[in-house]
A protein has these predicted regions:
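Bacterial Sec-dependent N-terminal signal peptides
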Residues: 15-32
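Conserved SGNH/GDSL esterase-like catalytic core that processes O-acyl groups on lipids
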Residues: 34, 38, 42-124
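Conserved catalytic region of serine esterases and O-acyltransferases that act on ester linkages
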Residues: 210-265
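Single, functionally critical "micro-switch" positions that shape active/binding sites
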Residues: 18, 39, 231
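Alpha-helical cap/lid subdomain in secreted, periplasmic
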Residues: 89-233
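Sec-dependent bacterial lipoprotein signal peptides
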Residues: 1-18
Length: 265
C-alpha cells in the first residue's frame, strides 16, 4: 500500500470510529439530498465546499440552503433565540417549504441545556419535513497550539486521547443519544469534522504530508490560518470528504475527487 493511500485510509478509519453507529447512519440517496446547513466559521467552509464535492461525486440533485453567523451566534440555540433575525427567518422559510432531507447544525455551546437549540429546531422542522435527517458537525478543539496542555489539564496525554472523550462522553452521551431517545423516528448522527484538523496537524508534525504545508500560515499552504485554528484549504478538503462520507455514505478509499493536494485525503 502506498504512502498516499495509507494517508487517505486514515480518514476512512476515523469515520468508522467516530461517526454514526450501525442502524443510525445516513440513508443512501443516489441523486442527492435537499439540505439546510447552519453554523459558524468552523462549519461554513465544509458546508460550502460540500456543494462542489457532492456534484463531483455525481449527486446531481444535491442542493443546500446555507446560513452562517460567526462564533456562538452560529449555534443552533443562538439562531433559535434570535427569532426575528434575517438569518433565522431564512432558516424557517427553507424548512417551511418542505422537502428538506437533511438539517445539519454545528455543535452548540449551551452547556446548561445542550439539547435545547437542537430540540427546538427539530420540533420546528418535523411538521413540514417528516422524513428529515439531523446531522451534528463536531468541530475540533480550538487553539491548537494549546491542545496538549489542555488535554493534560484534564488528565490525558494529548489531544488524541482527549478528543474521543469529548465526542463520546460529551457529544454522544449528552446530546446525540438524548436526541435519539426523544425522537426515535428521526435519523440523527454526528459528523466528526474535527478529526480533519487534528489528524492533519499530527501528520504535518510527523512529516507524513506529501505537500509543503506549514502548521500556521496562509490558507492555501497551511493546516491552520490563525491561532484559533481556522481551517487551511487542506483541512477544508479533508473535512468535506468526511462530510461526504457521513452524509452520503461514500467510500473515501475509492472516491476520485481531486482535492488539489498530493497527499491522499
Amino acid at each position: 500500500m502506498s504512502l498516499l493511500r495509507t494517508n487517505g485510509m486514515i480518514f476512512c478509519f476515523i469515520l468508522g470510529l467516530s461517526a454514526c453507529k450501525k442502524d443510525d447512519c445516513q440513508t443512501v440517496t443516489p441523486n442527492g439530498k435537499r439540505m439546510v446547513l447552519i453554523g459558524n466559521s468552523f462549519f461554513r467552509p465544509y458546508a460550502e465546499n460540500l456543494d462542489v464535492v457532492a456534484a463531483d461525486a455525481g449527486y446531481d440533485d444535491h442542493s443546500s440552503t446555507l446560513v452562517f453567523r460567526g462564533g456562538e451566534n452560529g449555534n443552533a440555540s443562538s439562531f433559535w433565540d434570535d427569532s426575528t433575525s434575517e438569518e433565522t427567518m431564512s432558516i424557517k422559510a427553507a424548512l417551511d417549504a418542505g422537502g428538506v432531507e437533511l438539517f445539519a447544525m454545528t455543535a452548540d455551546g449551551d452547556t446548561l441545556n445542550p439539547t435545547r437549540g437542537f430540540k427546538a429546531w427539530i420540533e420546528y422542522a418535523l411538521p413540514n419535513n417528516p422524513n428529515i435527517e439531523i446531522g451534528l458537525s463536531l468541530p475540533m478543539v480550538d487553539f491548537p497550539a494549546d491542545w496538549d496542555a489542555r488535554a493534560q489539564a484534564f488528565g490525558y496525554n494529548d489531544i488524541h486521547e482527549l478528543y474521543p472523550v469529548i465526542i463520546d462522553s460529551i457529544w454522544h452521551t449528552n446530546v446525540i443519544d438524548v436526541l435519539r431517545a426523544e425522537y426515535p423516528g428521526v435519523n440523527i448522527y454526528s459528523i466528526p469534522t474535527g478529526w480533519a484538523g487534528i489528524t492533519l496537524a499530527q501528520m504535518q508534525e510527523d512529516s507524513l504530508l506529501n505537500d509543503d504545508i506549514d502548521l500556521f500560515g496562509a490558507k492555501p499552504t497551511s493546516i491552520f490560518t490563525d491561532a484559533k485554528g481556522h481551517q487551511g484549504q487542506i483541512v477544508i478538503e479533508a473535512g468535506t470528504l468526511i462530510w461526504l462520507a457521513s452524509i452520503y455514505g461514500d467510500d473515501l478509499a475509492i472516491n476520485p475527487y481531486d482535492t488539489g493536494f498530493e497527499t491522499d485525503l
